[in-house]
Amino acid sequence: MAGCIPEEKTYRRFLELFLGEFRGPCGGGEPEPEPESEPEPEPEAELVAAEAAEASGEDPGEDAATVEAAEEGVQDQDPEPEEEAVEEEAAAEGEEEEEEEEAAAPGHSAVPPPQPQLPPLPPLPRPLSERITREEVEGESLDLCLQQLYKYNCPSFLAAALARATSDEVLQSDLSAHCIPKETDGTEGTVEIETVKLARSVFSKLHEICCNWVKDFPLRRRPQIYYETSIHAIKNMRRKMEDKHVCIPDFNMLFNLEDQEEQAYFAVFDGHGGVDAAIYASVHLHVNLVRQEMFPHDPAEALCRAFRVTDERFVQKAARESLRCGTTGVVTFIRGNMLHVAWVGDSQVMLVRKGQAVELMKPHKPDREDEKQRIEALGGCVVWFGAWRVNGSLSVSRAIGDAEHKPYICGDADSASTVLDGTEDYLILACDGFYDTVNPDEAVKVVSDHLKENNGDSSMVAHKLVASARDAGSSDNITVIVVFLRDMNKAVNVSEESDWTENSFQGGQEDGGDDKENHGECKRPWPQHQCSAPADLGYEGRVDSFTDRTSLSPGPQINVLEDPDYLDLTQIETSKPHSTQFLPPVEMIGPGAPKKAYVNELIMEESSVTPSQPERSGAGELLVSFNLGSTGQQICRMENLSPVYSGLENEQFKSPGKRASRLYHLRHHYSKRQRGFRFNPKFYSFFSAQESSRKIGISLSSLTRSGKRNKMLRSSLPWRENSWEGYSGNMAIRKRNNISCPDLPWDYKI
């Protein structure tokens, strides 16, 4: 076809393949039976005789006379010869049939062999609701078409065009045959439409349109801009998946809008108490958006009204069908160079411009002061029950649905608009399962690292973000949509203003424990409730985790082992630093430990060794202070010392006996929480060493390792039994003789 778009061949090819798999609602899963072939009529006797005469070279006239004479002779004969002739004829026919069967060879048979039955076709999408109103027919028709087409990887432009054409055909047809009249108290109630019958009509129209377009593909203008998107959603630890998302890059084509700039629509809905509200919003909100009068000139206000209309209609549906669920939602609508955002609840969207996170919205949560005042003014309350909740129930202050919580949980959306000047990188739309554990700067870091590692390939960015939220401890459903606003194949550069550095998550801290480098600083304001992940949730097998430094601890099991390389504290010269020998990386296990940790330098100076209290019981004590400066594994061993005791603050010391005198298990505290396993150590100082009676010196070297359930400490010292009084005396002086280690997540006393 002259003047056709370059993709027309691709579209035609898809339609051909699609029709091979999709035969409409009446096709079911079985092929249509083929019509049986009618038997050929037997040739008349005269024609057979004429053909035989031609073959023998005789005159047809003579043959005809012969035939007539034969017939007269037959009539004059007795009946007995007639019966014999019939028997002979039957025998001849039997011989002919046998000859035909013998002549019929494989491949030459007149009757084709039975064809094998084709495999059943995939089932058609089933409507998620049994009944709908007339106002919901358009959204339901579009959704059924798009589901079926996207199942076969239909191009979005073609899918939008087919869905629009099918929906128009359905809306123009007579829907009265699908209606279910409903009467209440003798008065006419709401007229509803049976969705199963509607679905049959939709798929029948879709099949018909596809057949027509294969023969004569209509000219369609192609969109000017396509936004590359990366989408991923997981159920995670929840029993059901209650998130829904919508991605409509061809908004104008889907609604046949010819007088508007290029438009795109993206949304995430996070349901609670059931999935019905999220499904309803994902199917009907964009349809309600287009129907608003102010949509052509004020999309932001149209979005707010669309939320309100969707909420009202779902509340009515919930009353008819006894539904008790709701959903939060965030919608981004792009028209030309304008970005419009509307939301209810705690689902969020963030914009990244020049490598920096830009705040676009503030989620609706009960702890917001304005939301709290609104709820209390209506007679409700906001209480703490694991989280701030409205009337002790829901942890969001606005949502679609939740009819039993109205008016405290309202469906009024907030909106915001911003101009896109071309410096924007991408948008991240996600539910609270993502933003509760990953803050904006961390998300930017994840995307930037992924693009650098994959040469700008953005197809798996959403998977990476979902994995980061899951590893950070999120147990909720997680849905992430990343909409790229520019070509990400170009070099990805983080702006100079950013606090992120390549080695932000390696090495120890040099700022006295302040972890600014690990988290970065957002240059623009952001809601404080989402600024960091829980500190007690660790990443399995990741050194560059985004949680607080405390989650990078070696894990719940620590072993102090022997090592021949140690520092002699008495041999340190003035102002000459010494360090231990570097060890190879040691494999570690535990929910809060990286897979590998490295031994960092252990630097000590002469000034760090000072005499302490006077000798007690013949043993001198040294107070040794130094900075290990590492969160990895350290080595510390004590040799030639007097007996040293280990224990925990506020814990009673228990000796394991002679045979286990070298192995002391330390008791720890554990607690269960909803998002996983949490370990709370209850001790705060590191080492307390006593001077040896043989005056050889004090040598320190300790190695910590992580296990899964317990922590243990072992030393090569000649431990010996001691009385309770001796133990009490040593425990009394323990607090005054210690080596402080502010950078380690746990400190031990020996």
Swiss-Prot record:
Binding residues for Mn(2+) 2, per the UniProt record? Answer: 270, 432, 476
Where does the record place Basic and acidic residues bias? Answer: 515-524
Record's SUPFAM superfamilies? PP2C-like
Q: Which residue intervals make up region (Disordered)?
A: 21-128, 495-535
Cofactor binding remark: Binds 2 magnesium or manganese ions per subunit.
Gene Ontology BP term (one): cellular response to lipopolysaccharide
- EC number per UniProt: 3.1.3.16
Q: Kindly list the cofactors needed.
A: Mg(2+); Mn(2+)
S-adenosyl-L-methionine among keywords:
no
Q: What class of enzyme is it?
A: hydrolase
Region feature (7 X 2 AA tandem repeats of P-E): 31-44
Q: How does this chain assemble?
A: Heterotrimer. Interacts with PAX1 and ARHGEF6 (or ARHGEF7).
Protein name in the entry = Protein phosphatase 1E
Name its species.
Rattus norvegicus (Rat)
Q: Which gene encodes it?
A: Ppm1e
